[in-house]
Amino acid sequence: MGSIAGSNETEAIMWRGLMLNRAVQHFLEDVKWGDLDYLLIDMPPGTSDIQMGLARMLPRTDVVIVTTPAKAAQQVAARAADMARKGFLRVAGVIENMGPTVNPDGTVTAMFGTGGGQQLADSIGVPLLASIPLDEAVTAGGDAGSPVALEFPNSPAGVVYRQLADVIVADVAPPIEIAECSLRGVLARAGADLEGARQRAETQ
């Protein structure tokens, strides 16, 4: 998106649903991502055209719901999980961001409350994958253009991010050959076959 927006980082890109979906499609189909093990797509909150378009374009995708402990954030995240399931996507789990922080003196600071991630996970029936503490190192790493897990691996958030990566690799995203054998994969391939047959019939 930076290439599209140009050098003016404060300029708004005012696109409607069709243009957004076309842009997402170009990112997925035309960008040379290289030899990837996983492609993580950070989506905006809510249930917008982008989420619905991705659900259609990536039918064998797992969804990870991110929330803060705040009640309002949980409600938005719960709607995102519901939309994912209505799109026949698997909700793999919940990540709590901006969670409680353990101070050097051992006290705990919970700027946005506690337990919200676990409450959301329980309410939608999925595991809590991680609770990422509110940590200055995350901001410093982001401003430096380097992930906190690499720039500050021993920081509280850096440790949790590395543990979360292990969880995702081991438990969340199955190898592609397993995903293709799942019911969701079978339905996706069947849908592709039907669409191909429909297009061939229209050209005859």
Roles of regions detected by a PLM:
Residues 17, 73, 157:
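Short, conserved glycine- and acidic-residue-centered signature motifs
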Residues 1-3, 7, 139-146:
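The feature captures the short pre-catalytic strand/loop hairpin that immediately precedes
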Residues 1-40, 45-58, 78, 160-191, ...:
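Flexible phosphate-sensing "switch/lid" loops adjacent to ATP/NTP-binding sites
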Residues 26, 30-33, 37-144:
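Conserved catalytic-core segment of NTP-binding enzymes
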Residues 144-159:
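C-terminal boundary of histidine-terminating zinc-finger modules
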Residues 14, 67, 107, 151-154:
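Hydrophobic alpha-helical scaffolding
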Residues 8-11, 64, 148, 152:
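Short coil/turn segments at secondary-structure junctions
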